[in-house]
């Protein structure tokens, strides 16, 4: 690391080496050369004066990029594409005259951007599938463990620890659907020329429109795409960047919601994120176990969600066939959206793979509230024994208010069960009430819902994507 210049936190702390490489100059310029080779091959196949020997020469130097030469040309030309055209030409003297034939800068620039986004989305998909697998394992393990539910962060009907985790899972499943959709519908720009009319290629092909269309089709096929944009200006529609970044923002929303839930649960001492043996939570308060990883997920997620506004503004501000005010913004915003979501998913996998659950705390909190929730069952049992429903309802209200005061005002334990057992109107004993207060009686279909969801939705996803499972993540704290 150079300590005398700015170093991006994405490189030093957040993004994986895999994602950093996808957005590296090396990946970019090697892709340029692959595109020039694909163009030359397609032009050869369609009858232009491009020889197989020239193509083989291009292929021989596809990966050994002469960066120093390109940099010298850029000082002279002030144009990155032409600098690399000339640098490539020095390595391929026989093919020099056909490199970039008929193309404009966006042929390599925009097509490379789409290829890069596809590669990055595939890495995102891999990590998303592993995140789903991690949470699914947790949900299955704890599907039967009752816990207090919360609405408005106030005590509500009980659920189970595993069922709560399925809410996180459902979000991720929806995100995976969106990633798959974007991957399935990505299109290359193709070979459209300076204003999208393919005029230069129409000239090369002596007015043959079908060959111009076939050129696009063959380039798409060679680069692994189903199609190119059927119409465009000089660039592909910048709305594509918005679609991709919105997809990443959806993942960020899911991860942020999870991190917020976990931070609240850690405060309640019910579930904690992993905490290393020698990890320090605070420089001042030695006892602290701060949820640093969850906080980082939340922090980076905000960045991705806000960053998605950049391509939206860029797409809306393009003039006619193109303007260059997109370039600097998209160069930063799209790359950093991917670098950030990559770091978020690494954290998500790391945290969910090592969640620490405290069953006794979970049970104690549930049991402190369960008597209030069981009052209707207790009342119905007393009515069956001959009690008056309206009278019993009023007594439960009074006992509940009194028990609530003991907890909130006096800081004592919930004594509602003792109060009801001591009231002859209910014709019951403490033992009979405690028999009603079995947490499993109050969780509804939570265990079954969890099991069904895992079996019917999650397992097929994991089976379909089993070749993506087993990712190793490294967290830089």
Model region roles, listed by residue range:
Residues 272, 395-402:
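Active/binding-pocket-proximal capping segment
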Residues 175, 179, 226, 233-327, ...:
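Glycine-rich anion/phosphate-binding loop at the beta-strand->alpha-helix junction
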Residues 163, 242-250, 377-385:
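Short, well-ordered beta-strand elements within core beta-sheets of diverse protein domains
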Residues 303-389, 395:
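Long, amphipathic alpha-helical stalk/connector segments used for oligomerization, subunit docking
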Residues 2-220, 281-282, 292-296, 391, ...:
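A helix-coil-helix interface module used to build multimeric assemblies
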Residues 140-162, 272-288, 321-328, 353-373:
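Glycine-rich cofactor-pocket loops
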Residues 39-42, 124, 128-131, 135-138, ...:
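Amphipathic alpha-helices that form helix-helix packing interfaces
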Residues 20-24, 69-71, 279-299, 321-336, ...:
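Short beta-alpha connecting loops at secondary-structure transitions
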């Amino acid at each position: 690391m150079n300590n005398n210049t700015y170093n991006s936190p994405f490189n030093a702390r957040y993004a994986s080496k895999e994602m950093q490489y996808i957005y590296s100059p090396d990946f970019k310029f090697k892709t340029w050369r692959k595109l020039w080779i694909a163009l030359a091959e397609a032009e050869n196949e369609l009858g232009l004066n491009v020889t197989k020997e020239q193509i083989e020469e291009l292929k021989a130097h596809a990966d050994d990029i002469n960066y120093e030469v390109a940099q010298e040309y850029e000082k002279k030309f002030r144009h990155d594409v032409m600098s690399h055209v000339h640098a490539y030409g020095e390595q391929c003297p026989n093919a020099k005259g056909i490199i970039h034939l008929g193309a404009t800068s966006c042929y390599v620039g925009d097509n490379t951007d789409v290829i890069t986004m596809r590669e990055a989305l595939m890495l995102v998909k891999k990590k998303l599938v592993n995140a789903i697998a991690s949470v699914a394992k947790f949900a299955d393990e704890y599907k039967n463990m009752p816990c207090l539910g919360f609405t408005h962060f106030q005590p509500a009907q009980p659920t189970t620890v595993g069922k709560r985790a399925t809410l996180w899972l459902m979000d991720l499943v929806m995100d995976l659907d969106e990633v798959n959709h974007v991957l399935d519908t990505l299109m290359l720009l193709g070979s459209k020329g300076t204003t999208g009319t393919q005029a230069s290629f129409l000239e090369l092909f002596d007015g043959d429109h079908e060959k111009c269309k076939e050129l696009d089709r063959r380039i798409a096929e060679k680069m692994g795409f189903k199609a190119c944009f059927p119409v465009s200006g000089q660039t592909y529609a910048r709305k594509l960047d918005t679609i991709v970044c919105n997809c990443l923002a959806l993942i960020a929303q899911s991860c942020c919601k999870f991190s917020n839930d976990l931070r609240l649960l850690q405060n309640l001492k019910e579930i904690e994120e992993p905490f290393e043996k020698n990890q320090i939570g605070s420089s001042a308060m030695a006892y602290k176990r701060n949820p640093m990883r969850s906080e980082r997920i939340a922090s980076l997620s905000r960045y991705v969600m806000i960053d998605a506004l950049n391509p939206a503004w860029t797409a809306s501000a393009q003039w006619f066939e193109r303007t260059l005010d997109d370039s600097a913004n998209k160069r930063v915003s799209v790359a950093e959206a991917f670098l950030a979501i990559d770091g978020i998913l690494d954290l998500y996998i790391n945290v969910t793979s090592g969640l620490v659950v405290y069953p006794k705390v979970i049970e104690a909190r549930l049991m402190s509230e369960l008597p209030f929730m069981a009052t209707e069952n207790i009342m119905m049992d007393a009515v069956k024994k001959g009690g008056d429903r309206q009278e019993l309802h009023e007594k439960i209200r009074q006992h509940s208010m009194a028990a609530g005061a003991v907890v909130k005002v006096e800081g004592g334990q919930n004594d509602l069960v003792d109060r009801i057992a001591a009231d002859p109107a209910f014709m019951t004993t403490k033992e009979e009430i405690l028999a009603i207060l079995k947490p499993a009686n109050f969780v509804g279909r939570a265990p079954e819902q969890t099991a069904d969801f895992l079996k019917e939705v999650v397992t097929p996803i994991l089976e379909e994507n089993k070749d993506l499972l087993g990712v190793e993540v490294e967290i830089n704290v």
